[in-house]
């Protein structure tokens, strides 16, 4: 009888496929078989790229005369630790009775790469048709749909091309420039860090991230605080008093004065005191009064970078730990695919979203969540999701945002406590998009004292809306604006207060009000914050925005450095090779002395490796290959030209 073979990336995923297909046969050595189906699995990567010395024994030694190394026929090999499982997979792929092969690897570029390497090395039965299963979750319905709608493998060839190119690019840049810089500068680095010898590890993405961390640290280290002095006026009427902050205007006697640090602060305290003296006895008039209503929608759904950043802030865990947790939730059928860059869902998913909501209502027993869901249903908040900003097919490439499936609750009680907390964060963000916007009442007020301007405002939340889901405590305090704050100021005066609204209610434009007092407030500039292990992930995702050239920035809009699947591992590697430190309690990221020395070497030898522009443009190129906008050989030619050109320039510098 003809057989159908499914190959998954992990044994646990294979078991889910077996359940869905109702295969009750006993698990054999590395696979499961029924009358119709055979299911086997990889254990992550089974095949890897060969080291240079496999090509030529001379390449075992790091010597200048063997560089640059760019093979024209690439060699691959089975990873020794998983040779047995590869043999099992290979034997199944080559069986004569297998007529259809389903590639059910992880639905992404790296998952495609893992499976394609296996197929390349195993040489499947040429008569068998190979299909690709592409799924967004591991629910029964989604697995059934994935098998039913599996497409011919050839439709994913461009994705596979980009995966091969990504691996080749990282291999060539890592091997050639790690060796070359180590040969040229290794002794100098060893001397600087007081070690007997040192190698320099270079990576397309890793080195750029090191550059971001070191640059931020040096910006902080070299920052010189500047003290300045702000003037706060206290005004009032029979309803009470309010504070307003002075700000220079074109009619002010201080306009363009060298005595000012900025538009609302003096360089010297004595000048501020002198200015206050000049205000004595002058009338205060309300010259502008603006009342407005504001609405604020719930934030977009989580992609991997956003949830990693959120979990670092909330739970002080590293990005790779967050991914591991969400991967477990995914494999337990509780959430959708984790390695996604999208923060929206598709129209098709939105039309069926009631299944997710009904599943939450029936299965998720968290008391607060049930209250929020019941309110949402009774108030009919969940209608017309398709027409909102949370649904956008054009912003989805491989997978939509991370959302709860409404299934998998048979596995929930066995989850570790931290996994439950992360799940709840995902659930709450999901529920929030169905709630109405938060609503605010706001008043902006301008007081003029002769030619001088003082500004104040008041803002209060009048309807919690989605904040009932995401910010149930101290909402008004959290949402209060700090009017006229000076950027990078660590001494901010709150002249925007919800209590001001009570004072403002009877005030009218043109009215004279009483001046109670003027005071001087000390202020000082503050340096930028250090990255933590979550915010550096977001910075990597948005690295394209750091590019100064507007035309290029627009050209590679949306390109980050690394991918959602790899960013956490890159941070982990930088820490492992002791280029950065991550504080276990705060998750604050700082460079080590070794990391800074390596940065200086790279900054001298090949500074473009530290610039997000280069890395983001390479990533954009890989994306263009996947989308069939350029050919794989075009990308490879550019890569080889870059390596040869950069190598020649570095050798001249020796």
Question: What are the residue ranges of the model-derived segments?
Answer:
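Basic, low-complexity terminal or inter-domain segments flanking catalytic cores
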Residues: 2-5, 24, 28, 82, ...
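OB-fold/S1-family RNA-binding modules
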Residues: 52, 97-102, 144, 243-269, ...
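Conserved PLP-enzyme active-site core in the AAT-like
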Residues: 206
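C-terminal helical "lid" subdomain and adjoining coupling/linker elements of P-loop NTPases
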Residues: 192-201, 213-268, 314, 338, ...
